Amino acid sequence: MQKQAELYRGKAKTVYSTENPDLLVLEFRNDTSAGDGARIEKFDRKGMVNNKFNHFIMTKLAEAGIPTQMERLLSDTECLVKKLEMVPVECVVRNRAAGSLVKRLGVEEGMELNPPIFDLFLKNDALHDPMVNSSYCETFGWVSQENLARMKALTYKANDVLKKLFDDAGLILVDFKLEFGLYKGEVVLGDEFSPDGSRLWDKETLDKMDKDRFRQSLGGLIEAYEAVARRLGVKLD
């Protein structure tokens, strides 16, 4: 399957059309951003690591009964996916307090959250992805209440699957975001799951193994990504 026209260039991925109107190519680039794209740097191997990481996770979620847009890997940095009508709202699950939750509520970083917190954010960099709720989604027509309920259920199911997967690899799944779309009327998991959109800590040391290493200028970003991938059993080379 050959990529054709560039349809969209995001902060770290480029989307291309194919000869099949129902399929797209996602290309993972080496770009890494923080501050809603205000700071961008390139890291060798990052596109490859995230592409293979994402394929691995999407495969695990599909095996657990979660519908995903993933079709197959095409190359080190590209995968073939179903074309979705994306919902402009992203779902976040928090198992421990970190990031914006700590800033907003003043709670201690690392505090266990039981049950996990479910948040919704409007995908809009210019507005810094404001938090919204189901009432906003209904009023502004972003997603139906039925589909939103399905998104929430699938997000919690993904959390159950991934918490165990990472725990078995000696990692804490602190939080993560998921994006969904519609494929022929069905809610389907889209975009990606990688250390770019999740927080992962080492279970013993609590070392951060995700994009916070870039956000907080801790260094060792790709080394951390590759370490997480190898612990999970992702074949990188």
From Swiss-Prot:
SUPFAM superfamilies: SAICAR synthase-like. CDD domains: SAICAR_synt_PurC. It catalyses: 5-amino-1-(5-phospho-D-ribosyl)imidazole-4-carboxylate + L-aspartate + ATP = (2S)-2-[5-amino-1-(5-phospho-beta-D-ribosyl)imidazole-4-carboxamido]succinate + ADP + phosphate + 2 H(+). The keyword Zinc-finger does not apply. It holds the Pfam family SAICAR_synt. Transmembrane segments: none annotated. GO terms for biological process: 'de novo' IMP biosynthetic process; cobalamin biosynthetic process. GO terms for cellular component: cytosol. Its EC number is 6.3.2.6. PANTHER family: MULTIFUNCTIONAL PROTEIN ADE2, SI:DKEY-6E2.2. Belongs to the SAICAR synthetase family. This is Phosphoribosylaminoimidazole-succinocarboxamide synthase. The lineage of its organism: Bacteria, Pseudomonadati, Pseudomonadota, Gammaproteobacteria, Enterobacterales.
